[in-house]
Structure formats: C-alpha cells, structure tokens
UniProtKB/Swiss-Prot annotation:
GO terms for cellular component: ribonucleoprotein complex; ribosome. One of its GO terms (molecular function) is structural constituent of ribosome. Keywords: Ribonucleoprotein, Ribosomal protein. Transmembrane segments: none annotated. Pfam families: Ribosomal_S21 (PF01165). It comes from Shouchella clausii (strain KSM-K16). This is Small ribosomal subunit protein bS21.
Amino acid sequence: MAETRVRKNESIDAALRRFKRSLSKEGTLAEVRKRKHFEKPSVKRKKKSEAARKRKF
C-alpha cells in the first residue's frame, strides 16, 4: 500500500503528485481497473495472446 507523508513546507499538489507516482510504480491503479469487472478466463487468454503477438512485432 502506498503511503505518502506531506513534508514540511510542501504543497498539497506536490504531495499528491508524489502519491500518484508511487501508485503508478506499484501498479495499484492498473490492478484496480483490471479487477473492477469480472473477466472470463477465455477473454484473459485472448488478451494475453494478443499482447504476446504485439510484443513479437
């Protein structure tokens, strides 16, 4: 779990940017989006094979 403490004399915007950066590094937001709706195993396999095909070319 990402945790960001606001430093002394740091603006909220800067702290929020640091927090969002840490979330993206961990992959938390991507994981939440992926788990938001159920995905059938056949669809997962299809996406996985398409991603492999894209990497190949």
